[in-house]
Amino acid sequence: ALSVVSNVVEDTWVDRLGVNTKDHLWLVVISLSAAIVVAIPLGVAAAKFARFGQVILAAVGIVQTVPSLALLVFMIPLLGIGGPPAIVALFLYSLLPIVRNTYSGLNDVSSGLQESAIALGLPPGARLRLVELPMASRSILSGIKTAAVINVGTATLAALIGGGGYGQPIFTGIRLDDMGLILEGAVPSAVLALLVQGMFDVADRVFVSRGLRLTIEASRTSRRLRWFWSPIRRWR
């Protein structure tokens, strides 16, 4: 008689953590990168073309109102089960914060700076590249940070459609009533969200100069004061 000896090596929680972290980061990085490439031009178009801008903001706003689980389910008939539908859903969820912050950041650029750029003879493309986008950079970075943190949390639902990530141990733990498995996914997901937020806070201080931050805040304060005082002046 033949005896078959099988050596079964169980994965440790460290091994599972490594695999889940890789899958989770893959979902977040791919979807966020695609959203940045698409959303910033959409935000610029929304700021430059008023009528078209309202359509863009309304469209990305509607996507954001769809529940995340429903959006993932809608992707299954189109893309099947696994990573691709999860990436597309996360990509769509990432659009609104980046588009909105790009739009508001460009609108917050003071008219004085724009007039100075025009006086220097800069064409529209150069004004956008050299003046307006640098002034809006802090707002755009804030939108990307918001989208990244949202993605880290929402990506846990990708496990429901076979996307992997930290949601895998969470939902397995719920089915088995195993708190250890639930924490195996919940704790790293929370830590990753905090790390992402901290990383973007550091990037804000490194890539946005202190003088530019002060200029942006002064520009926003000036716009708010004009908005506050204009009705009072008309009433007088």
How would you label these PLM feature ranges?
Residues 50, 107, 183-236:
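C-terminal transmembrane helix and the adjacent membrane-cytosol boundary/short C-terminal tail
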Residues 19, 26, 42-75, 90, ...:
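Cytoplasmic-entry segments and transmembrane alpha-helices of multi-pass inner-membrane transporters
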Residues 77, 154-189, 208, 212-217:
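Glycine-rich helix-loop "coupling/hinge" segments at transmembrane-helix boundaries
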Residues 16-28, 76-97, 137, 181, ...:
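Loop-to-helix entry region at the N-terminal start of transmembrane alpha-helices
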Residues 37-42, 56, 85-114, 144-152, ...:
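Membrane-embedded alpha-helices of multi-pass transport/permease systems
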Residues 1-33:
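Periplasmic/extracellular loop-to-transmembrane helix junction in inner-membrane transport proteins
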Residues 101-146, 170:
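Short cytoplasmic-facing helical segments at TM-TM junctions of multi-pass membrane proteins
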